Every structure is written in C-alpha cells, then in structure tokens.
Amino acid sequence: MGDNAEQAVQTDIDIAEILARIPHRYPFLLVDRAEDYNPHQSIVGIKCVTINEPFFQGHFPGNPVMPGVLIIEALAQTGAVLMSKSLEVDTEGKTIFFMSVDNARFRNPVRPGDVIRMEVEVLRARSSIFKFKGVAKVGDKVAAEAEFAAMVVETGPKA
C-alpha cells in the first residue's frame, strides 16, 4: 500500500463509522471494517464472507463462489469510505456514486469462510472525483483487481 503508514491518522474504522459514511445496508453492505486509513491516499477494507450471504443461494448451489462483480463492488465501497472520510463528506444530502470500472481482472475464487482484504489506493483526485486502484486478496492470493472512479453528488435532503 505504499510507505505512508506514518501518516495514517486512524488505524481502524469500525462498522458504525462505515454506516455513517456510506448509504449501503444489508444485504448490499460489503465492508465490515477498514484499517490503515491514509487521508487522500489509501485504505484497507475487510469483508468476512460467510455462507449466510444471500448471493450464495444461487451462485452456485453445491459450489458457493462470491460473484466477481460483488468483489468489485466491495472495493468500490471501500473507496467510498476513503472518499467520504478524506473529504469530510456529510452523507446528509450527498451520495458517492460509482462512475466507471476499468481493467477488472478476476484471479481466484472467494468462498464462504474467506476474509477479503481490499487494498484501495487513490491514483488521482480532483475536486469531488476520485480514481482508484483496488486489489482484493484472500491470504496472499489476489482474488480480483480493478481501477474505478467515483464522485460525490449533491442529492438533496432525505425525504
């Protein structure tokens, strides 16, 4: 993740703060906690995968594998936590939207019982738009990787 560990201002981000920073909820919240947060630079998200995940009912019966697109979504949610915290975005009236994904690669399957470590770093940031590179690992094996972009959008107050 780079040599910026000494600049980290917060080691761990718990689920309560994640819920305050991004709008995703069960069954679509795919980040359990985060660590190694470096403002405007990088973050590591953690997802503990269990057999109780709703997608395992159909993907695939008898051979459960986490869908690759959901691994990319988990990377994007981790990036959204980094953006929200770095920009001090108040989630009231604002939403971070996924804009694009490039160079997605799926290397190894993620199965029930795995812990995904999602290493996300900022490649570029301009105003409210961030471009990221993310790598999802289980142990020392890369499960998926991609570059993706997101932006903060004014959505108005909640109804």
From Swiss-Prot:
Described function: Involved in unsaturated fatty acids biosynthesis. Catalyzes the dehydration of short chain beta-hydroxyacyl-ACPs and long chain saturated and unsaturated beta-hydroxyacyl-ACPs.
Enzyme's top EC category: lyase
Location of the active site: 59
EC annotation from Swiss-Prot or TrEMBL: 4.2.1.59
GO CC annotations on file: cytoplasm; membrane
Disulfide bridge map: none
HAMAP family tied to this protein: FabZ
Entry similarity comment: Belongs to the thioester dehydratase family. FabZ subfamily.
Protein name (Swiss-Prot/TrEMBL): 3-hydroxyacyl-[acyl-carrier-protein] dehydratase FabZ
Molecular function, one GO term: (3R)-hydroxyacyl-[acyl-carrier-protein] dehydratase activity
Location in the cell: Cytoplasm
Source species, domain of life: Bacteria
Organism name: Caulobacter vibrioides (strain NA1000 / CB15N)
